[in-house]
Amino acid sequence: HYELVEKIEKEICKSLDKGDPKYNTNLCHLDFYKNNLKIKFYDNWIPEENVKPNYDTLVYEFFKYNEKPFTVRPIVKKYEVDPSSNPYEFNSNLIRDKYIDKQLEKTALVSYLRFEDGQITVDKISPNDRFGKFIKNDTKLRSMSVGKTMTSYVAGHAICEGYIDNINSRLNDWPLIENTLYYDQKLFDLLNMQAGDEKYVWSSDFLLPSNLDGVDDRTKDIKVYISEFKNSKKGKSEFNYSAFSTQLVLNYILFKTGDNFEKILEKTFKEKAKIKHSVFFYRVPGSSKERGNANIMFFATRYDYLRIAKAMLDDWQNDTCVGKYLKTIFENRISKDNDKKERRGDSRQWHFARGYAGQFQTHYTGINKKRPVMGMHGRGGQHIVIDFERS
């Protein structure tokens, strides 16, 4: 995208001849560019609320968010699932949605798909003069917290394949977490973010002094992280949004499945969802399965995310074993207690959904909380919402 940069010459190169040994040593034979964007930089991710970034800042944030893992800091290890030999092919009956068109033209919305009555009815990508030049149908998109729901779906398959007894199985057979608040907890308490760890973690952050930056660094394994929780004590079993709970769930599946972990991933995404392109979770480099080297950050194409969501819908509507798992976690959904947390000055989690069900968002604003509508929400405005009985 040369329109975003301008070619420059390194200062030291201006005084060197091409025959000078220092010419190559200083990389003067290479082209150098600097961006011509007006970017507002943030210490971490761009805040999700109360900011009005310009287009250039959004371009940079999208690069950092989605392209940096493949370019500046390439992913070297991953748990990757190959495409299905018979991928699911969608039928389409497209209609125009003026509201969605306007959002794509005016906002940072990158991609929008609507699937109803067995077919895609809206299929849009941001215009080329916005973000369309950075995304194609085979572009792998970063999940952020949508990876939490992917982990839950894998857990359902691990249970249905007999590796884990049920959602109430206790984590009392995993030596890695002994002498921590997580030992002997029910799997479902971790899935529902009710581990009693509110004094220690929130979202991706440690609340107590720590030498670690956060709980979702792809270069750190569970053995490293769990050392921060030695001799920790369980607190109240209330909703506490934490990436670490999900990291534990994924790595407990890894522990229970052992050499068959990749088979469970294939069962979930290749056989069930019939993905067209590969999908993957991060894998911690220089680590091992015994140390807990799976990471919940997930990547898939826009259509493969839809294929996975459709597989969930099919499981529910066909009352499969995994469908029963999805129904069970919905029946045992909890309130996120955002109002109570706000009154006492605590952090609240995405207030447009007031309930939580095993790594799914529930009780969306304007929708009856008894209605089985569950969704996935990831940082940066990612949403996959499934109406299980009306789709």
Where in this protein do the model-derived segments appear?
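N-terminal leader/targeting segments and the immediately adjacent pre-domain N-terminus
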Residues: 1-134, 162-165, 192
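Non-transmembrane alpha-helical segments in soluble domains
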Residues: 59, 156, 172, 188-191, ...
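Active-site Gly/Thr loop motif
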Residues: 275-277, 282, 331-390
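Catalytic-site signature segments of enzymes, centered on catalytic residues
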Residues: 125, 137-138, 202-286, 292-296
